[in-house]
Amino acid sequence: MKRIAIDAMGGDNAPKAIVEGVNQVIEAFSDIEIQLYGDQTKINSYLIQSDRVAIIHTDEKIMSDDEPAKAVRRKKKASMVLAAKAVKEGKADAIISAGNTGALLAVGLFVVGRIKGVDRPGLLSTIPTVTGLGFDMLDLGANAENTVKHLHQYAILGSFYAKNVRGIANPRVGLLNNGTEETKGDPLRKATYELLTADNTISFVGNVEARELMSGVADVIVSDGFTGNAVLKSIEGTGISIMGQLKQIINSGGIKTKIGASLLKSSLYEMKKTLDYSSAGGAVLFGLKAPVVKSHGSSDVKAIFSTIKQVRTMLDTNVVGQLVEEFAKETQVND
């Protein structure tokens, strides 16, 4: 049985979307037990009772505008902190939260703990593409500054995730850069390019420009956290703007526009479905001793369901256990 601890009070739509997502998961999968941390009265108002769902009551929660490290230190009984402690103490196998990203990174690092040999765990997310396959990208903001070693480890981590969780036999790894030529980029990117080229354990396809990301040029994209986060927000913003503009044009157009939109309705729906982030799951703080997954702050029921399903796959494949063994081998070699 897979035991998943969930911060029921994190996110814009908590606890409603969280609990309703749990209801769907319990119905869909018989091998999952859920621990919901938060206000019992509020949770119960949406929960379909099940012997595979436990509520751990707490009145305390970390707010979206709380200073992450300070909040984790001071709010010992916060729903997110208690969920992380359950993982550390072996009472749960993974944690999910749609709450404060910085706070989740803090509890991930300081409560759950990082795998020996991993210098800086990276925030990894599977981003949908027009091909329908998507790509894994890290780091998406766990670390504002990175070294060459960090980026090399992100390539290893990303490849490992793509193989074991997404089932890609030989994932192509690309380095996000300002040009495809090997001479492009700042010293960090140039040195990383050389290191990735020399590593025959990964399938490095070279530098990748941001404009190529959505075409599926690689299965794993490596970036420093600052740049990765900026690119992710740009992709999200562009998608929202395009869909909003399409809707405005259709609503304000004449009869010909509306007829055309009606004819294209199924195609537009398929495009939206292909690029829908809510079916891709959450962002994994990868490199920790257990799955720590951040669901989008505005997650709806579908996104919560997808995130729990994603964690189920991570536990099924024992990706973290395999990663611990992999880095233990590397540590022994380096020693």
From Swiss-Prot:
Pathway: Lipid metabolism; phospholipid metabolism. This is Phosphate acyltransferase. Belongs to the PlsX family. The gene is plsX. It is an enzyme of class 2 (transferase). It comes from Streptococcus pyogenes serotype M6 (strain ATCC BAA-946 / MGAS10394). It is found in: Cytoplasm. Its main location: cytoplasm. Catalyzes the reversible formation of acyl-phosphate (acyl-PO(4)) from acyl-[acyl-carrier-protein] (acyl-ACP). This enzyme utilizes acyl-ACP as fatty acyl donor, but not acyl-CoA. GO terms for molecular function: phosphate:acyl-[acyl carrier protein] acyltransferase activity. GO terms for cellular component: cytoplasm. Keywords: Cytoplasm, Lipid biosynthesis, Lipid metabolism, Phospholipid biosynthesis, Phospholipid metabolism, Transferase. GO terms for biological process: fatty acid biosynthetic process; phospholipid biosynthetic process. It catalyses: a fatty acyl-[ACP] + phosphate = an acyl phosphate + holo-[ACP]. Homodimer. Probably interacts with PlsY. Its EC number is 2.3.1.274. InterPro entries: FA_synthesis, Phospholipid_synth_PlsX-like. PANTHER family: FATTY ACID/PHOSPHOLIPID SYNTHESIS PROTEIN PLSX (PTHR30100), PHOSPHATE ACYLTRANSFERASE (PTHR30100:SF1).
